[in-house]
């Protein structure tokens, strides 16, 4: 049991406690749906808002106790998704990945390689689009003939994933994807 925090930078203003205890039901629902890919985000958000009306939600155990009835057959995986959503919101992780990717063409020399490991689909999606199309969101650039222009040559057509041996030794590696692209 720990205090709801989840900040990677302890001096950052926003903590998980702030999100859980100050966000509106709609804001919580968006966080859980967008970053946790939780289908019943509306019900979970309503339960959090109802619970905090009497007392603030201070610890991870308190939040787990509120979320557990909504987990269904997913159990611990559901709780992991709830806390993943909070962590991503608190640390603005997707924005950090996107900002990093946008800077890479300027700092990487021609022939330089971009190697990125992602651990879940929300991280992998912008990486995949960037190395495949040269953009994170929106339409990729096209040349005069309608061909896609991308400043990257894929070194790995598909992401490199952990082998069964690796996942046995290191269970956390099961979701890791490694993508490699070369600046052209």
Feature map (PLM): residue ranges:
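S-adenosyl-L-methionine-dependent methyltransferase catalytic core, i.e., the SAM/SAH-binding region
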Residues: 1-184
């Amino acid at each position: 049991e720990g205090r709801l925090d989840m900040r990677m930078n302890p001096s950052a203003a926003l903590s998980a406690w702030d999100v859980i205890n100050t966000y509106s039901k709609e804001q919580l629902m968006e966080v859980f749906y967008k970053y946790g890919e939780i289908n019943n985000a509306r019900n979970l958000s309503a339960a959090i808002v109802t619970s905090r009306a009497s007392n603030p939600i201070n610890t991870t155990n308190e939040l787990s106790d509120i979320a557990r009835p909504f987990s269904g057959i997913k159990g611990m995986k559901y709780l992991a998704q709830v806390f993943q959503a909070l962590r991503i919101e608190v640390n603005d992780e997707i924005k950090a990945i996107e900002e990093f990717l946008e800077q890479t063409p300027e700092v990487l020399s021609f022939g330089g390689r971009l190697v990125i490991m992602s651990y879940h689909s929300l991280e992998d999606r912008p990486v995949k689009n960037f190395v495949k199309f040269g953009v994170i969101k929106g339409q990729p650039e096209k040349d005069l003939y309608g061909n896609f222009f991308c400043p990257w040559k894929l070194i790995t057509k598909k992401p490199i994933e952990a082998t069964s041996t690796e996942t046995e030794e290191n269970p956390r590696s099961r979701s890791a994807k490694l993508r490699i692209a070369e600046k052209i």
